[in-house]
Regions:
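Non-heme di-metal
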Residues: 2-218
């Protein structure tokens, strides 16, 4: 009976992870929080609009990756070490990341931009990395969240220097996302996340650089 119950819970966790992936890639995201955006965004010229759309596409890809990461790590928390509290912690962060997905998706549409054509690849890669981190243990898994969120926070800060100041809506979205990412990193650290070795963090930055460079164009 216990074995059957464990298998049932594992199957449920797998189904939830698959459902999360399908919704991320193919459904229209809906935010759980309303974002108070400026309504007086002045018209952007063609170059400004193109640049903003390019940066917002990169941010949208980052949120697709976040969904893959958190889905995999929540799955790992349930399957590898049966920790519902940790899985719940990760899923709560995922809900806020889904808000980011919705905000960037909507802004991309407003800018007449399109999502990256490689979103399924980005999601799959992030899911695989998240599952690997989870397999290495709770502290590594949470440490991976800390490092990821800190790098995303720095990335968003750089976008705030690159977005045209007149694009007040995009700037407001990025600023709010940056605040959320900083909070997610602190929570994961407080929950026991370890500091990852510098070579690992450097490899993560390298992978992120490839993703952002490609996503700006494709």
């Amino acid at each position: 009976v216990l074995i059957g119950l464990a298998m049932s819970r594992t199957a449920d966790a797998l189904i939830n992870a698959i459902d999360s992936g399908l919704r991320t890639l193919f459904a229209t995201p809906h935010a759980s929080r309303a974002l108070d955006l400026p309504t007086d965004n002045p018209p952007l010229n063609a170059a400004q609009q193109r640049d903003s759309a390019s940066l917002m596409r990169v941010n949208h890809v980052g949120e697709v990756c976040a969904q893959g990461l958190y889905a995999a790590q929540a799955l790992g928390a349930r399957v590898f070490y049966k920790d519902e509290a940790l899985a719940g912690h990760l899923e709560a962060a995922s809900v806020e990341e889904n808000d980011h997905l919705a905000w960037t998706s909507e802004r991309l549409h407003e800018l007449n931009g399109r999502p990256s054509l490689l979103n399924p690849v980005w999601y799959a890669g992030s899911f695989a990395m998240g599952l690997l981190a989870a397999r290495l243990g709770k502290r590594v898994s949470l440490g991976f969240v800390v490092a990821t969120e800190q790098q995303v926070e720095a990335h968003l800060a750089s976008h705030m220097t690159r977005l045209d100041p007149s694009d007040t809506r995009s700037n407001a979205i990025v600023a709010h996302m940056k605040q959320d990412e900083a909070r997610h990193a602190k929570r994961a650290q407080a929950a026991g996340g370890m500091t990852l070795p510098q070579p690992v963090q450097a490899a993560m930055r390298g992978a992120a650089k490839i993703m952002t460079t490609v996503a700006q164009r494709i």
